[in-house]
Design a protein with these regions (language model features):
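A short linear-motif detector with a strong N-terminal bias
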Residues: 37-39, 66-71, 106-108
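Extracellular/luminal regions of secreted and cell-surface proteins that mediate adhesion/ECM remodeling
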Residues: 78-234
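Catalytic cores of secreted or luminal carbohydrate-active enzymes
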Residues: 43-98
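Catalytic-core regions of glycoside hydrolase
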Residues: 1-64
Length: 234
């Protein structure tokens, strides 16, 4: 975007960009702008197309201000900031509404990545049930890798798990938690991934509300669960 070869970044522009676009699906990719040399300054449309194709996760905000300020003036810088890196949106979901302790809970979630890239570091994923009355919380770690939630793609998470046999009767809200996998950061909500949907983020916990509520009931509404995936009390 700064010159024919982006100041020597590329030799074969078409092939090199194709290669970097694939690498950027798995590795950190980004950079900075430069004073245009022999080409017209990149406008918003061109800039966003290039960053998405190259899977950018970061942009130097200090250089080159002549180009960065142009994007601000054209009104796309906020959108660039939102879509830089990954941007996960919950598009739909379904779940078992009434479940008996010790029985099967089914949840299906669909998440779209509207960002330029995917996460390049490992990330934990948990399904959380929290009692509406006393806030008692149950957690289920999921065998899901958000690094595989690629840009412009929708991913499906299918969960079949059991409730503890001693789980108290009552209503429970369902949350999705994507904490940092490091033990020292796992319970720090500042390091949890926030979904882009409005009205779902819980800042004090780092949980994302799925806007779903199940009723744990003594009535046998679902099949008995005999598998290994069982929620545990936090």
């Amino acid at each position: 975007m700064a010159s024919e070869t982006d100041y020597g970044t590329y030799q074969n522009v078409t092939e090199d960009k194709k290669y970097l676009g694939q690498e950027g699906l798995y590795l950190p990719m980004g950079g900075e702008t430069c004073p245009p040399d022999g080409v017209s300054p990149a406008d918003c449309s061109k800039a966003q197309e290039e960053m998405r194709n190259l899977r950018w996760s970061y942009l130097n905000s200090d250089y080159y201000k002549g180009v960065n300020d142009r994007w601000i003036a054209q009104g796309c810088m906020d959108k660039i900031k939102r879509e830089m890196g990954y941007r996960f949106v919950l598009t739909s979901g379904g779940y078992t509404t009434n479940v008996t302790p010790g029985h099967l809970l089914k949840v299906v979630l669909r998440v779209k990545n509207e960002g330029y890239a995917a996460p390049f570091n490992p990330r934990a994923v948990e399904l959380v049930l929290r009692n509406v009355s006393d806030q008692t919380t149950y957690v289920l770690p999921l065998d899901v890798d958000p690094r595989k939630w690629k840009p412009d793609m929708e991913s499906t998470i299918e969960i079949e798990a059991g409730l503890p046999t001693d789980m108290p009767i009552g209503d429970y809200d369902i949350y999705l938690n994507l904490p940092d996998p490091m033990e020292t950061l796992r319970d720090n909500p500042d390091y949890s991934i926030q979904l882009a949907n409005e009205g779902v983020w819980e800042a004090e916990t780092g949980y994302n509300s799925l806007l779903m509520r199940i009723n744990v009931t003594s009535d046998e509404k679902t099949d008995i669960y005999n598998g290994d995936l069982v929620f545990t009390k936090k």
